[in-house]
Each structure stands twice: as structure tokens, then as C-alpha cells.
A protein has these predicted regions:
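Alpha-helix-loop-beta-strand connector modules within alpha/beta enzyme cores
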Residues: 84-101
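Conserved small/polar residues in nucleotide/adenosyl-binding loops
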Residues: 136-138
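Conserved, mostly hydrophobic/aromatic
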Residues: 19, 69, 104
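Short, acidic/polar
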Residues: 50-61, 114-129
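Acidic (Asp/Glu)-rich catalytic clusters
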Residues: 59-65, 96
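Glycine-rich, proline-tolerant flexible connector loops at the mouths of alpha/beta enzymes
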Residues: 71-83
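Active-site beta-loop-alpha junctions enriched in small/polar residues
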Residues: 20-26, 74-76, 106-110
Length: 138
């Protein structure tokens, strides 16, 4: 989704809210965690599956109300590769539902490195960064 389309969606919904997807495992309802752990064990895979299922429910509930979501990378990265898969699947699902996605990675580096972070973040998705350091090499 382009920034122009995001602006149109904000006007259409009359809502500029960006919903944060910061799925700390302790925030997730027990029935979701229990189902994920039953299928994958109390492993990184189980935790990541719980994050993904929780996010899908939130996205389903919010997609007609808000124009954008902002998954916080740290809550996914802490679960290793399974967590990164959950982040990628969350982003894919949000985009399927018509939401603009801002990856909250709070990366903090110079412009060329920020370009690499941006390229790494799963295609047509925005990522936040440190504006001062990013401008040093422009």
C-alpha cells in the first residue's frame, strides 16, 4: 500500500490510528497459548504460533476500523526464527486485509545501513528508524 493509499484510507475510515501489535506472550489469552502449545509444545514454535493466532484475531477485529498496524519487532525476534516467521505471516495477513504496515524496529544506524534494514523488512512495508543518523550520508 502506498502512502497515498494510506492517506485515502485514513480519510475513508475517518481514523488516523495505527494499532500497535506488541504481542507479549503474557498478554495472550490462555486458550490461544494452550492451543499453540498443545500443537507445538512449549517451544519457540509454540510461542510464535500463539503470537500469530493472537495477531490474526486482532487484525480481523481492527481491519475495518484502523488503516494501519505496527508490529514491534522485538516481540517476534525474541522467539528466534519461529518468531520472525510469525512476524512475516502477521505482515502478510495484515496486508491481505488491506492494512498499511509499519514495522517498529527502531533501527538506529547510518543511511546506507538503514537502506539495508528497510530492504530486509519483508517487501512493501515501512520501518521506523533514527532520523539523525539516517541523514548523515545523504
Amino acid at each position: 500500500m502506498s502512502l497515498d493509499r494510506l492517506i485515502e484510507k485514513i480519510a475513508e475510515l475517518k481514523n488516523p490510528t495505527v494499532a500497535g501489535l506488541d504481542p507479549k506472550l503474557s498478554y495472550i489469552p490462555d486458550f490461544i497459548k494452550q492451543d499453540a502449545f498443545r500443537r507445538h509444545g512449549e517451544t519457540l514454535e509454540g510461542a510464535a504460533e500463539a503470537l500469530l493466532q493472537f495477531n490474526r484475531g486482532l487484525i480481523d477485529a481492527l481491519c475495518d476500523i484502523v488503516p494501519a498496524v505496527k508490529p514491534q519487532c522485538a516481540y517476534y525476534e525474541m522467539y528466534g526464527w519461529p518468531g520472525l516467521r510469525a512476524l512475516a505471516e502477521t505482515i502478510r495477513y495484515a496486508k491481505e486485509k488491506g492494512l498499511f504496515v509499519i514495522t517498529d524496529g527502531k533501527r538506529n544506524d547510518i543511511g546506507s545501513t538503514m537502506e539495508a534494514y528497510a530492504a530486509a523488512h519483508l517487501g512493501e512495508v515501512s520501518i521506523n528508524g533514527h532520523p539523525f543518523l539516517s541523514l548523515i550520508h545523504i
